[in-house]
């Protein structure tokens, strides 16, 4: 089995359905004998260019270990899910379990916002 990193861009109107989508994809992976090493919800972020006339999307990053058959099934599910605007799958040499650079940036932004709110109060 190989290690993969999957980045998903979800339609911003479907943000409340992200946990259910994650559970469905995790179920597909574990049913096929794979494992989920890391799931990061990067939140709603600005897109560099418009996709389907949308300026924002909900970003997800999932690191998994799965067989090729499971990956084909998951990518097939991504293609036929209208909420998934884009997806990118990258093969990794080893499992990534620590927080990614993007997640550290998201955490820094959230900490800065809470500090600003405390100073304003």
UniProtKB/Swiss-Prot annotation:
CDD domains associated with the record: bS6
Species in which this protein is naturally found: Polaromonas naphthalenivorans (strain CJ2)
SUPFAM superfamilies: Ribosomal protein S6 (SSF54995)
Signal peptide as annotated in the record: none
GO terms (BP aspect): translation
Record's compositionally biased regions (Basic and acidic residues): 105-115
Classification via HAMAP family: Ribosomal_bS6
Job of this protein: Binds together with bS18 to 16S ribosomal RNA.
Taxonomic superkingdom: Bacteria
This protein's UniProt keywords: Ribonucleoprotein, Ribosomal protein, RNA-binding, rRNA-binding
Protein family according to the UniProt entry: Belongs to the bacterial ribosomal protein bS6 family.
Recorded GO CC terms: cytosolic small ribosomal subunit
Region of interest (Disordered), residue spans: 99-121
GO terms for MF: small ribosomal subunit rRNA binding; structural constituent of ribosome
InterPro entries to which the protein is assigned, alphabetical: Ribosomal_bS6, Ribosomal_bS6_sf, Ribosomal_S6_plastid/chlpt, Transl_elong_EF1B/ribsomal_bS6
UniProt name for this protein: Small ribosomal subunit protein bS6
PANTHER family registered for this protein in UniProt: MITOCHONDRIAL 28S RIBOSOMAL PROTEIN S6, SMALL RIBOSOMAL SUBUNIT PROTEIN BS6M
